[in-house]
């Protein structure tokens, strides 16, 4: 029998004690319950994220939100056609709101430096919520 195959005896164990300490770990930050964001809160954050020069990640983190979530909300808003980003060359915010028909099936509403585009068949209550947030 080689040394590795020899059965361990009390005399061998007596000279080679090993001590193991079991550590338990807890997360540094406990997981919070997911927050429910209202449509108005989402619209406000998306509007801020669409501002020229906006730092989307910083905006998200300032609200305790994962940046990927705000990017997803922004992407959804843009793909829906309900909002559009303004470019850096956009004029300074104006003090009035403009409402225009863009063809027969689309309306465009400008509130300050935010442009809201919606289909003519948009739910008025949903549009009102969006407009309250971007005012």
Swiss-Prot record:
Q: Output one GO MF annotation.
A: transposase activity
Biological process according to GO: DNA transposition
Question: Where is the region Disordered?
Answer: 1-36
Which cysteines link up through disulfide bonds? Answer: none
Q: Which keywords annotate this record? A: Plasmid
Matching entries from Pfam families are given as: HTH_Tnp_1
Tell me which domain of life the UniProt entry assigns to the organism this sequence originates from.
Bacteria
The text of the family note is: Belongs to the transposase 8 family.
What is the protein name given in its UniProt record?
Uncharacterized protein y4rG
Query: Species name for this entry?
Result: Sinorhizobium fredii (strain NBRC 101917 / NGR234)
